[in-house]
Swiss-Prot record:
Organism for this UniProt entry: Streptococcus mutans serotype c (strain ATCC 700610 / UA159)
Origin organism lineage: Bacteria, Bacillati, Bacillota, Bacilli, Lactobacillales
Keyword Metal-binding: no
Keywords: Cell membrane, Membrane, Sugar transport, Transmembrane, Transmembrane helix, Transport
Coiled coil: none
Gene label: msmG
Descriptive protein name: Multiple sugar-binding transport system permease protein MsmG
GO biological process, one term: transmembrane transport
A Gene Ontology cellular-component term: plasma membrane
Residue intervals of the ABC transmembrane type-1 domain: 69-263
Record-stated family: Belongs to the binding-protein-dependent transport system permease family. MalFG subfamily.
UniProt function note: Involved in a binding protein-dependent transport system responsible for the uptake of melibiose, raffinose and isomaltotriose.
Length: 277
């Protein structure tokens, strides 16, 4: 290895190490603080909890965090399932017909235009519309998530199919007597596994951690709050008592971290191939 390459690798490792430390320190402080009393947090912010206490988590359970956790779980699971059921099929149809029919190119271009529209531009009209339609509830929030998930998810699936799923598979299946639905269900859909994992993680992270849409749609009815919305109001309730707030953050982190660890091996392949058109 040349001297210049060694220097480049050295600085890359330095930057990665520094970046890792900057990410891990706040996470470590959050975990430690969730097991401390507030006076210990104030006096020994970076120290390991001594003694370890579960009082913050007990108070969190007593304050009904389970209900808000359930709300977030239902919204996230239903939204992800619908996205992964319909968008891959739409992407397959578009990817296979873009080169043959101009209408599919136009349709695809219109659908992915949403990527370039900032949410802040349509935030107020969307809120007013959902309220007037009587959809200022969990079902309305799911509909909005599905709508906003279409552009990015469709873009990734179409790119992945065009790059990694050759047309010859369709032709071979047709020769064997399979119709389009059978071809998609038994051949194409299983081959999209890396992209399924990628879109699952991307959308689940967004749906689970999103704060702005629940604030706009669900804030009037506390029984429908999601976990991030509960954390926001909970932090305000315990403004001078940091322990329960830190515990609520850990509850939100653990679930999505587990999902990420399960599917992480497929994410890089899905992102790298799906981003290439």
């Amino acid at each position: 290895m040349k001297k210049e390459e060694k220097i480049n690798y050295f600085w890359k490792y330095v930057l990665l190490t520094v970046g890792g430390i900057l990410i891990l320190i706040p996470l470590m402080v959050t975990v430690f603080s969730s097991f401390k009393k507030t006076k210990d947090i104030m006096n020994h912010f970076f120290a390991f909890p001594n003694p370890i206490t579960l009082d913050n988590y007990k108070r969190l359970l007593a304050d009904g965090v389970g209900g808000y956790f359930w709300n977030s779980t239902v919204i996230t699971v239903l939204s992800v399932l619908v996205v992964m059921l319909f968008i891959p099929a739409a992407a397959y149809s578009i990817a296979r017909n873009m080169s043959r029919r101009k209408a599919f190119n136009i349709m695809y271009s219109l659908l992915i235009l949403g990527i370039f529209v900032p949410f802040q531009v349509i935030m107020i009209p969307i809120t007013v519309m959902m309220s007037k339609l009587g959809l200022a509830n969990m079902w309305g929030l799911i509909i909005l998530y599905l709508t906003y998930a279409i552009p990015q998810t469709l873009f990734l699936y179409v790119g992945y199919i065009k790059l990694s799923v050759p047309d010859s598979l369709d032709e071979a299946a047709e020769i064997d007597g399979a119709d389009k639905l059978t071809t998609y269900r038994k051949i194409i859909f299983p081959m999209l596994k890396p992209m399924h994992a990628t879109t699952l993680i991307i959308n689940a992270l967004w749906f689970w951690n999103d704060f702005m849409l629940p604030l706009l749609i669900l804030n009037k009815d506390s029984s429908m709050w999601t976990l991030p919305l509960f954390q926001y109001n909970y932090s305000g309730q315990y403004f001078n008592d940091y322990g329960p707030s830190f515990a609520s953050y850990i509850v939100g982190i653990i679930t999505i971290t587990i999902v990420y660890l399960i599917f992480q091996k497929h994410i890089i392949a899905g992102m790298s191939n799906g981003a290439v058109k």
